[in-house]
């Protein structure tokens, strides 16, 4: 978005400030897209003989898709069957990529994170038409899934939770994650 683009109509602004985000399906694609975005800004400035200042900060890493955890899936099935309505439990397509991102993706690059999505809403999360249309599914079933998942993972001395941790292959160590994120903190200025 252009956050500053001049103060007067019909006058070429002396300063234009653009803020943008780069998102991608994996960390390598993020680095590639960020380099291309910076190159595009430099090229645009060069084309019109302008100075270009680029300040880069890291954003969220993408969420990592994984097969449904059997304990969470079982919890979802139990919770959906114990409700007033009959809700269908569907495994998420692990090949699909969402353009949205949160800090969950960052945590998943370091340690295992079990996530699930429930319904009970209409429209996109940040849209003007967003609304909760099924309180039972949005709140009650979701809370039951959380509680049952925790119980199933932690019973028998946390046997299933320990399996999740033991079988997880992290993308980064904590130190490597910090180094990767710090590598995006840059500032450059090009004068013509």
Predicted segments — roles?
Residues 74-76, 82-144, 148-149, 153-191:
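Zn-dependent metallopeptidase/amidohydrolase metal-coordination segment
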Residues 7, 191-192:
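Basic/polar N-terminal segments that are highly enriched at the extreme N-terminus
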Residues 1-79, 95-105:
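Midchain, well-structured core segments that form catalytic/ion-binding scaffolds
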């Amino acid at each position: 978005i252009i956050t500053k683009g001049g103060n007067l109509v019909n006058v070429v602004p002396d300063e234009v400030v653009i803020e943008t985000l780069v998102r991608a399906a994996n960390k390598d694609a993020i680095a590639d897209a960020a380099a291309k975005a910076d190159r595009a800004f430099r090229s645009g400035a060069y084309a019109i003989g302008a100075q270009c200042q680029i300040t880069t900060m890291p954003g969220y890493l993408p969420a990592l898709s994984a097969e449904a955890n059997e304990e969470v899936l079982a919890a979802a099935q139990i919770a959906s069957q114990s409700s007033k309505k009959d809700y269908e439990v569907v495994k998420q397509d692990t090949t699909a990529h969402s353009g949205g991102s949160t800090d969950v993706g960052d945590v998943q690059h370091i340690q295992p994170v079990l996530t699930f999505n429930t319904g009970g809403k209409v429209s996109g999360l940040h849209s003007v038409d967003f609304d909760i249309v099924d309180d039972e599914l949005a709140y009650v079933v979701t809370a039951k899934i959380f509680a049952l998942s925790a119980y199933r993972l932690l019973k028998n001395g946390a046997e299933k939770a320990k399996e999740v941790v033991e079988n997880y292959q992290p993308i980064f160590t904590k130190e490597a994650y910090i180094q990767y994120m710090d590598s995006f903190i840059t500032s450059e200025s090009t004068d013509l």
